[in-house]
């Protein structure tokens, strides 16, 4: 395969290896050599593509955000009503790709290290804003703007909390149960509220 075609493949392999390595260790205290070994490439090649561990970690976070955004956009395009849009947003956050054990562990590790890294904190804020705005867009068609913001805030907190619960392992809700819990929360919050469509 020509070198120009190999670079995106190698970059993706290293990012996938970073997710696995961070997830397995539950820490960003990993080395480029460990990630490269997991990817089956040399540390020199990893440094060549990313220029160091910090840039590789940030590239991994950006990749996770892009994947989530891509999956979310595809799901939302299939939604025809506000309720379908809300269901799509929730389902994507608990899809097999997003709710995988190593991916969850990587996300939680990023949250911990956001306290020391402005770059990681900025990317996590981007994620939170996107989730919130997507939920509000659908919810404000069903209730007031203020109420939509409050429900979206609660739903976002539930999603984050369910990721933490799942990372704990035993007795944690599976994806289907997690989806049902968030959907039930939103339905209860909307019940009895005057619809914006009326």
From Swiss-Prot:
It comes from Brucella canis (strain ATCC 23365 / NCTC 10854 / RM-666). Pathway: Amine and polyamine biosynthesis; betaine biosynthesis via choline pathway [regulation]. GO terms for molecular function: DNA-binding transcription factor activity; transcription cis-regulatory region binding. Coiled coil: none annotated. Keywords: DNA-binding, Repressor, Transcription, Transcription regulation. Residues 31-50 bind DNA. The keyword Transcription applies. This is HTH-type transcriptional regulator BetI. SUPFAM superfamilies: Homeodomain-like, Tetracyclin repressor-like, C-terminal domain.
């Amino acid at each position: 395969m020509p070198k120009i075609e190999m670079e995106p493949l190698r970059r993706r392999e290293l990012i996938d290896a970073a997710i696995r390595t961070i997830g397995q260790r539950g820490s960003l205290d990993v080395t480029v050599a460990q990630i490269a070994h997991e990817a089956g490439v040399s540390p020199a090649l990893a440094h060549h593509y990313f220029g160091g561990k910090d840039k590789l970690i940030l590239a991994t976070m950006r990749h996770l955000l892009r994947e989530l955004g891509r999956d979310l956009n595809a799901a939302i395009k299939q939604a025809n009503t506000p309720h379908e849009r809300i269901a799509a947003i929730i389902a994507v956050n608990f899809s097999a790709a997003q709710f995988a054990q190593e991916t969850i562990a990587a996300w939680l590790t990023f949250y911990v290290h956001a306290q020391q890294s402005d770059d990681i904190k900025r990317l996590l804020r981007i994620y939170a804003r996107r989730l919130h705005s997507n939920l509000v867009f659908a919810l404000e068609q069903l209730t007031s703007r203020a109420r939509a913001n409050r429900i979206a805030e609660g739903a976002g907190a539930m999603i984050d909390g369910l990721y933490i619960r799942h990372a704990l392992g035993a007795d944690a809700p599976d994806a289907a149960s997690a989806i049902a819990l968030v959907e039930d929360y939103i339905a209860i919050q909307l019940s009895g509220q005057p619809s914006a469509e009326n």
